[in-house]
Amino acid sequence: MKQFLDFLPLVVFFAFYKLYDIYAATTALIVATAIVLIYTWIRYRKVEKMALITFVLVAVFGGLTVFFHNDEFIKWKVTVIYGLFAGALLFSQWVMNKPLIQRMLGKEITLPQEVWSRLNIAWAVFFILCGLANIYIAFWMPQNIWVNFKVFGLTALTLIFTLLSGVYIYKHMPQDDKH
């Protein structure tokens, strides 16, 4: 259910884009993200920081897109979010000396420190590359290509990278934890 809720605003954005235009889609994205956030709070009495940050960025960049009738703002939102994620991962590793990935998964999974560090850096690089790809596609390709990339391309890339991360984690888990 949680994963469905996370993807619902993206589905709403895509549907409204196909039915109307980027501005209706952006308005629908803001509303859908707010509804999911409120529902999550009511249902679980907790909202993850990432969901809150995403909502704020959707509201700000989406609001600017609709207000100025300029789709460049919503296109930048994707890169800004990925940049923040990459920055948080790198900050956690180099300044806080404990990879954010380890903070998120370390209670459930036991891995050597160097594996946590590699995984953390890999995700940071992934987010940086996705952000750069978004800039290229958003500003040098037609709008419909960008929407498809945002909805399907980035989602597929994230799922593939998550699966590859899972394989990498499994490969480095202690034998007794694999059962």
From Swiss-Prot:
Pfam family, one: IspA
Residue stretches spanning the membrane: 22-42, 50-70, 76-96, 121-141, 149-169
Primary site of residence: membrane
Domain of life per record: Bacteria
Membrane topology, record value: Multi-pass membrane protein
Keywords for this protein: Cell inner membrane, Cell membrane, Membrane, Transmembrane, Transmembrane helix
GO CC term (a single one): plasma membrane
Family: Belongs to the YciB family.
Role noted for this protein: Plays a role in cell envelope biogenesis, maintenance of cell envelope integrity and membrane homeostasis.
Name recorded for this polypeptide: Inner membrane-spanning protein YciB
Native source species: Enterobacter sp. (strain 638)
Organism lineage: Bacteria, Pseudomonadati, Pseudomonadota, Gammaproteobacteria, Enterobacterales
